[in-house]
Design a protein with these regions (language model features):
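Secretory targeting and sorting signals
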Residues: 1-23
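Sequence/structural signature of beta-propeller domains
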Residues: 23-409
């Protein structure tokens, strides 16, 4: 592979790969930090990240502002999205909370700082992914066996009123995490397990998720046995692919069973989904890989992979590297950002593929979490291209589970 790095080389190249020290120009340009926060772990932090100079970290809302579950129970603030269109676009931050039962969706007024729960149900389990649609609704879903995807009807004129919602089983009963909705109404989702597939829902009518067809991705040229998840051969799942239509009667019961019936490609814990133009990115956590699905060319590329175009982590040796990619975000200049499900949890920024090999030209370390028990989740660029929102989930520091933002000065 053209950008292959050995672990030994990674010890030298912890900041960035194949590029200058400063990560691009634009509204969120930065100088990569020296490495993961291995020696800076603290449960009494004032700021949650080791971050580059020139950036300001500010609390948006934690459990001192809104404590949904009380006592020692973490709110498990997970994913974030703005009300991206309509009246007061960008004023409100809508968040999921990934608790095992009685899950919740909360809203923060970014002007006043007020935060309230707008949707909660005893049957909500592990609410995770969230996405604003171009038709003005909010999608959120459960990351659990039998998980459902819901469509919520958020009213920015009455933002703290109980939000009406409806289940959309036609998009698939799955272990949902990432959700990506295109302007034409197409929705991309995943099944979050080793052996999970990647799915595309095409509605019969744009904006109506109650009727349509779910498809699963199938890489071309592989036998049915080779389509199965295998930790030793997952890199073979690249190249040309097709979308295979699934049995909708089975989809609304268990879309993973429907995908298995057509021998759809299986991946290692696909988690978040991010759409940038006509490319869909999926973080495959077990594979230490982010794949790029080129919708125009019908080609799947390995966009980021530990040991290829980003160093492999070796904490025992003090080597910063890429480990367990989880959530994804698109910055205002169209770059893909990645956060790890790891301790210390790191945030990485990519530079687009300009030489046509399907890989990110550079992958650079932006920040690292200092709390010894926390992971970063929910990275999200909203309407301000100089601001990145993120959550600190299940920290050691008391009442600190919640949302922050980091802004370039």
């Amino acid at each position: 592979v053209k950008k292959h790095l050995t672990v030994a080389a990674a010890a030298v190249a912890t900041l960035s790969v194949a590029g200058p020290a400063v990560a691009a120009n634009g509204p969120f340009a930065f100088e990569p930090i020296d490495g993961s926060a291995y020696t800076q772990q603290s449960a009494t932090w004032a700021e949650p990240l080791v971050a580059p100079a020139g950036f300001t970290q500010q609390l948006v809302a934690d459990e001192t502002v809104l404590d949904i579950y009380g006592g020692d129970a973490d709110d498990l603030t997970d994913m974030n999205v703005h009300n991206e269109t309509g009246p007061d676009a960008g004023r409100y931050l809508i968040r999921t909370h990934e608790v095992g039962s009685n899950g919740a969706v909360s809203v923060v007024d970014l002007r006043t700082g007020e935060a309230r729960v707008v949707a909660q149900d005893a049957g909500f389990k592990r609410l995770d992914g969230i996405e604003w649609t171009s038709w003005g609704t909010v999608l959120f879903a459960e990351e659990t066996a039998g998980g459902r995807l819901f469509e919520g009807f958020f009213d920015p004129k009455n933002p703290f009123a109980p939000m009406e919602w409806v289940a959309r089983p036609e998009v698939g009963i799955l272990r949902h995490e990432g959700i990506g909705a295109m302007a034409d109404g197409t929705v991309f989702v995943i099944d979050e397990l080793n052996g999970g597939s990647i799915f595309k829902f095409v509605p019969t009518t744009r904006g109506d998720l109650s009727d349509g067809q779910l498809y699963a991705l199938k890489v071309s040229g592989l036998s049915d046995a080779e389509q199965l998840w295998d930790a030793s051969s997952y890199l073979a799942k690249s190249g040309a692919f097709e979308w295979v239509a699934l049995d909708m009667d089975q989809v609304v019961l268990d879309a993973n069973v429907a995908a298995d019936a057509v021998s759809a490609s299986e991946f290692g814990r696909p988690e978040d989904v991010e759409i940038i133009g006509q490319k869909v990115y999926v973080a495959n956590t077990t594979e230490d890989r982010v794949v790029e699905i080129d919708l125009t060319k019908s080609v799947l590329n390995t966009f980021v992979h530990a040991g290829d175009n980003v160093p492999t982590e070796n904490r025992s040796a003090g080597v910063t590297g890429f480990n367990s990619p989880d959530n994804l975000a698109k910055s205002g200049d169209g770059r893909l950002w990645i956060v790890e499900d790891n301790v210390p949890s790191d945030i990485w920024a990519t530079q687009p593929d300009t030489d046509g090999d399907g890989q990110a030209d550079r992958v650079e370390l932006f920040a690292s979490a200092v709390d010894p028990g926390a992971e970063i989740s929910g990275i999200y660029f909203g309407t301000d291209p100089k601001t990145l929102y993120f959550n600190i989930q299940h920290p050691t520091k008391p009442l600190a589970d919640g949302t922050w933002k980091i802004t370039r000065r």
